[in-house]
Design a protein with these regions (language model features):
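Acidic, gly/proline-rich low-complexity N-terminal segments at the extreme N terminus
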Residues: 1-28, 128, 173-176, 181-182, ...
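Amphipathic alpha-helical coiled-coil/rod segments that serve as protein-protein coupling scaffolds
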Residues: 16, 23, 40-149, 161-163
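Short, conserved beta-turn/loop elements at beta-strand boundaries and strand-helix junctions
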Residues: 18, 36, 139, 200-205, ...
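Surface-exposed patches in structured soluble domains
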Residues: 30, 44-51, 57-63, 127-186, ...
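Edge-of-domain interaction segments
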Residues: 65, 222-257
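Short, charged beta-turn/beta-strand-edge "cap" motif at the junction between a beta-strand
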Residues: 65, 71-72, 185-189, 235-239
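Short, compositionally biased
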Residues: 72-88, 166-172, 196-203, 243-252
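Short, solvent-exposed secondary-structure boundary/capping segments
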Residues: 123, 202-211
């Protein structure tokens, strides 16, 4: 045998160990508003005045826009007349001077007039149904609203929510209240805390996943709808055999083997 053949290969022995490894899964999602309301009247009106601008914070019940009040004024006159007429019929009915059918007919007319007036009040003064931020305004004062785009969009962003699709294999492990870590590309490695708010009860047979809704309190409003998010969920710890990375020899062209 040659000297080269007799040369022994030097081998360094490394010790493998069992370590407690956290079981993590990562998901991606787009941030959504907790509630999104499109605000517009039920029927066409001219917009008399706009009171809020994009970016404004508004409270529930705050006046956003005032529509032309011509129809409202006419409805108020009709309501007043119906109330007067009903009072007259009611007094006659009590003394036998009017029939029950006449009394019923007038009462129905009064109720219709009241409902019409109430509906016009709600559609003449547009109020925000939620506290939030104005994210869209599609009309100006003086414009004619005729349908299509809403006059305003208001979104509630305290909290915000994320929807992630989780593998069927984790169905029994995800529970309401489960705390998660969230990273947003715009904020780098900063971690935001969220909680599972809703676990959908069925599996999508096409993707073998189920939807999970996560909420972020977002009290400082730094997280905004549309941001790209990475969600990390922890599913406890398991013991795994761990070998030092330097002790692994990878074969060329063998991928991760």
């Amino acid at each position: 045998a040659t000297e080269t053949q007799n040369e022994k290969v030097k081998v360094k022995v490394e010790t493998v160990s069992v370590q407690d490894v956290e079981q993590l899964s990562e998901f991606t999602a787009t941030v959504e508003a907790n509630i999104k309301n499109n605000i517009a009247p039920q029927t066409p009106f001219r917009i008399e005045k706009i009171f809020a601008e994009v970016g404004d914070h508004v409270k529930a019940g705050q006046l956003l826009a005032k529509m032309d009040a011509t129809s409202l004024k006419q409805a108020k006159i009709q309501l007043d007349n119906q109330e007067i007429e009903f009072k007259r019929i009611d007094e006659l009915y009590k003394v036998g001077g009017a029939s029950k059918s006449a009394w019923d007919a007038q009462k129905t007319s009064l109720e219709v007039a009241r409902e019409t007036y109430k509906n016009l009040v709600e559609n003449t003064q547009l109020l925000s149904p939620i506290s939030g931020i104005v994210t869209a305004r599609n009309y100006d004062s003086g414009d004619m609203y005729s349908g299509g785009n809403p006059i305003y969009t208001v979104e509630e962003i305290r909290p915000v929510k994320l929807m992630v699709n989780v593998s069927e294999s984790l169905f029994t492990k995800v529970k309401k209240g489960h705390e998660v870590d969230i990273r947003l590309d715009v904020y780098g490695d900063e971690v935001f805390k969220g909680k599972v708010n809703l676990v959908y009860p069925t599996i999508d047979p096409a993707t073998r996943t189920f939807p999970v809704e996560i909420k972020i309190a977002n009290s400082d409003e730094r997280v905004r709808p549309g941001m790209f998010a990475r969600v990390t969920m922890s599913f406890g710890h398991m013991d795994h055999v761990v070998a030092p990375d330097r002790s692994i020899v990878k074969q060329s062209g063998a991928g991760d083997r």
